[in-house]
């Protein structure tokens, strides 16, 4: 879905779990809420104006710089990190500290929190969370190719694979309290 939007020169700018819907009966994934999306020719807002959800923003988006599809891929990386670990890669007590971390500090390796994950998947996440857009996947299609390749690899018999609810059991669910 993101690759299609990016090929149309549209950058979502607010990829986060609430904007990704999955129909488990059909395995269809939909990206929703293109409310702050922009055509890449005009993907920079007024100077100093930042739109989106800060914890999921790329370093360049937080800095108010020009963004392209690779910024959405960074946000997707944050979303996948949270999906796999139940935690955000960057957490801070203030907006300034959060922005500093996103711009300057590497995310904790996903394998620290989930040592059972394939090394190749950890590398993909690390690439998605790269500070520089040039170091990320060039497109959603390139990312999908990497993820398909990983999914097609056999799972080691000794590897612990948690049930889906294990990975998100600590994440509060709407209407069920925190």
Outline where the language-model segments fall:
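Protein kinase catalytic-loop region centered on the HRD/HxD motif
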Residues: 1-10
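Pre-DFG segment of protein kinase catalytic domains
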Residues: 30-33
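Activation-loop N-terminal segment of eukaryotic-like protein kinases
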Residues: 22-26
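C-terminal or otherwise distal, non-catalytic regulatory regions appended to signaling enzyme catalytic cores
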Residues: 163-178
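Conserved catalytic-core motifs of eukaryotic protein kinase domains, centered on the activation segment
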Residues: 40-43
